[in-house]
Amino acid sequence: MSTITQFPSGNTQYRIEFDYLARTFVVVTLVNSSNPTLNRVLEVGRDYRFLNPTMIEMLVDQSGFDIVRIHRQTGTDLVVDFRNGSVLTASDLTTAELQAIHIAEEGRDQTVDLAKEYADAAGSSAGNAKDSEDEARRIAESIRAAGLIGYMTRRSFEKGYNVTTWSEVLLWEEDGDYYRWDGTLPKNVPAGSTPETSGGIGLGAWVSVGDAALRSQISNPEGAILYPELHRARWLDEKDARGWGAKGDGVTDDTAALTSALNDTPVGQKINGNGKTYKVTSLPDISRFINTRFVYERIPGQPLYYASEEFVQGELFKITDTPYYNAWPQDKAFVYENVIYAPYMGSDRHGVSRLHVSWVKSGDDGQTWSTPEWLTDLHPDYPTVNYHCMSMGVCRNRLFAMIETRTLAKNALTNCALWDRPMSRSLHLTGGITKAANQRYATIHVPDHGLFVGDFVNFSNSAVTGVSGDMTVATVIDKDNFTVLTPNQQTSDLNNAGKNWHMGTSFHKSPWRKTDLGLIPSVTEVHSFATIDNNGFAMGYHQGDVAPREVGLFYFPDAFNSPSNYVRRQIPSEYEPDASEPCIKYYDGVLYLITRGTRGDRLGSSLHRSRDIGQTWESLRFPHNVHHTTLPFAKVGDDLIMFGSERAENEWEAGAPDDRYKASYPRTFYARLNVNNWNADDIEWVNITDQIYQGGIVNSGVGVGSVVVKDNYIYYMFGGEDHFNPWTYGDNSAKDPFKSDGHPSDLYCYKMKIGPDNRVSRDFRYGAVPNRAVPVFFDTNGVRTVPAPMEFTGDLGLGHVTIRASTSSNIRSEVLMEGEYGFIGKSIPTDNPAGQRIIFCGGEGTSSTTGAQITLYGANNTDSRRIVYNGDEHLFQSADVKPYNDNVTALGGPSNRFTTAYLGSNPIVTSNGERKTEPVVFDDAFLDAWGDVHYIMYQWLDAVQLKGNDARIHFGVIAQQIRDVFIAHGLMDENSTNCRYAVLCYDKYPRMTDTVFSHNEIVEHTDEEGNVTTTEEPVYTEVVIHEEGEEWGVRPDGIFFAEAAYQRRKLERIEARLSALEQK
């Protein structure tokens, strides 16, 4: 690491990229590269300040300077005073040695001019780089001369090594002596070297520091032979367990020594295990130790390892935090486009009740996680059956999932289906789009696109007409080419060769492709996922419902073109009894499979590998431990790194039975197995978590998990499992899944750095969407309250909404809608498409008896686009009532008539001559016929039924009599319903029905445990408004005008006859 960093000026904050012992050793300079005489050394506090140990903030104007230089200039005055005769602590020794090393590094990095330039400003006595280097050696040698700091022994000349510090020494195996390098660092020593061949022996080259035994006695912390009291004092000061006589070799019983260390060390102060393994006959309080582990054999021959804080470089994150039952992240996690996906089952309890296949995601290496997202809805036949998934992964760029259908009553498998969908990704491409002349289809070339018809794609900067924005795949030509349908065509061929363009796919906007596989025989569950190549993958399975057990895999060799085609293969039969839930992974042509042991009194889990995808196997049995959870794993280098969690406290060390129903403290372990050795006899299972919940909250059982590798870290995602309800401690008597009586089952992620020495911390972090989750208060009555305003920018799906008064005095409740649209009946009910409608009711239910009601019928309803107003009064205030379109719709109908109309004046009927044909007078044929029409008195039959002879008498005509007159006079065809004269009307009408609320019904529901619950469900019934029929009618105004014309003609004829008589 360089001790000099330079940045372009103009920023506010700058990073310090080197280590330093004191802030006074950090020098910040504004540089004018054109005129160095103008360079300005800044003063901390006035010109800049430290934001934290690795960041400064500029307070001064940087105008006139083009570079900000930050470098380290360590003072040569000893930071630690060795002359006072006091006992030095290990931290003092380390600081002194670091000071020497820092000065040497600065001598390496800084030029003579730079050293002179900052000599005064930094308070350094190093006049130039050579003086700094000599001073560093002087400090290091003075410390060593006092016998206070030893050399660090490294590898030998024969094996080779890169020496980077003055304190590192190499062994020359030929003479048994150690040598330090006295020249410029770093010094690379190739394998097969000697001191002579790699630089020579003498000042400025290799200098002997004596034989290895002497050096180890004086300065090696493992020795303490010549100066035992010095070492013991140091260890006691450091709270190193060896100060109390502990060996830490993993063989010697260190129980007594550790007990003494605990007794002598104040509570709250940690005992340092110095990275060693201590064998004990009973576990001490591990929380009081750091940087160590303990090997404990509660059962002889069955050792387990327990790691303390800082021994394993790992962190524990909580990645979900919901009131739901979040479990079963088993063998489904994967990494895609640098995002970690952790699929799991989200439900209200063990089983498939209200279950949704879900996932959470992390785009920042597991530091924070998204809110849970449901991938499946409830099954259409819910609550009889529901969806479930234990196998999911990405092949090429498409997500594949084995979606199982299971019964709620017994969790029994009834069907398997392979669902797949494109993952979201963004591509930056060059060329590859063509569009022929006079065609609307464009061909898109994207190697291994993984898309199917209907999948969403988005284009920008394509340089081809019509290929832009959101589109869908129209046809698939092959795995590298597909087409989209553009909105237009052009007269010439188009090709975007050489053009840079962008294409995106969307998981959420694309449909599932679903391939039904039916009920696969001899399968209890399908587990795990392993991508084999760009075309196919494997899924594990087990059968444990009936004997004999089966464990194996399904191999889908061509999942894109033949998703229903798979090959079934089993592990060796001697490993199948009592085995289940295989974890599978595929690395470098080898398929690995680990089973789960299911019986505490039988042999446990087993490990298998196959180089021909399950046709032949090499198998191992894990010794001693019975595993009641799966053992997910990943291959890192030559090691399989496996994780497993207990389902009962002390299961792995004391053989406790699988007991998910008891509140306890199950733990998580991990182990490594080298695939080149392929031997599990000496495998070490190391405890990495004591229990998974923060704050020491107990949980009743730890569920199965998944393992992924990203960059330099391995991630183990796992969760709680409780058979009774979503709460991990206790149970509510009514078994209401939405009442709180414990701590919810949630998911956790253990993140561990990959390396031969896994040490740093063992922390718990809350990574479940901090500051992004909706604040929810969850009361014990099952009601959730969101005490904050919320804004939804997309579709919001709600099963039931109650809007309460928004004011303290309960004056009103308001729904305020901004924009062009209000309530829209969007979705069609899946169980009854004909029932698409929206009901607005002024009362507390959907029945018109509770209040006035308006019902809007959707286009897919049996009564398409109908509006029904139901109330005792329909009042229109302060405005005219008008039809939208002029003279198009009628008021009432032949079967839906108003009884009467109350008007303040006579109605006005349009009689504009400009809208009529040339007027003609009544012809004699019509008037002759009209003379035969009878005017009568009558009573309505329905009125007679109600009132008898007191029914009112009406005046008018009979439409059928007018019809008969017209037929008799040749004005209508016999048996015809069509009349040329509008005075007579005939209408046929269809049967009219409606679905209305009838009553509430108590419905019983039985869960998988036989518990019966009841709900009150509304019952609707169909009512007939009227049956199919026909009606004859007349237009009264036509009758009046016809009668007037008839009478006028009659009077005219009488007047003509009188006039003729008078003339005689």
Swiss-Prot record:
GO biological process: adhesion receptor-mediated virion attachment to host cell; symbiont entry into host; symbiont entry into host cell via disruption of host cell envelope; symbiont entry into host cell via disruption of host cell glycocalyx; virion attachment to host cell
Keywords carried by this UniProt record: Coiled coil, Degradation of host capsule during virus entry, Degradation of host cell envelope components during virus entry, Glycosidase, Host-virus interaction, Hydrolase, Repeat, Viral attachment to host adhesion receptor, Viral attachment to host cell, Viral tail fiber protein, Viral tail protein, Virion, Virus entry into host cell
Residue numbers marked as site, Binding to sialic acid: 542, 545, 549, 578, 598-599
CDD domains hit by this protein: Peptidase_S74_CIMCD
The EC number(s) this enzyme carries: 3.2.1.129
Result of altering residue 328 to R: Almost complete loss of enzymatic activity
PROSITE patterns cross-referenced by the UniProt entry: ICA
Family: Belongs to the glycosyl hydrolase 58 family.
Parts forming coiled coils: 1044-1064
Species this protein is from: Escherichia phage K1F (Bacteriophage K1F)
Active site: 581, 596, 647
Name of this protein: Tail spike protein
One of the record's GO molecular function terms: identical protein binding
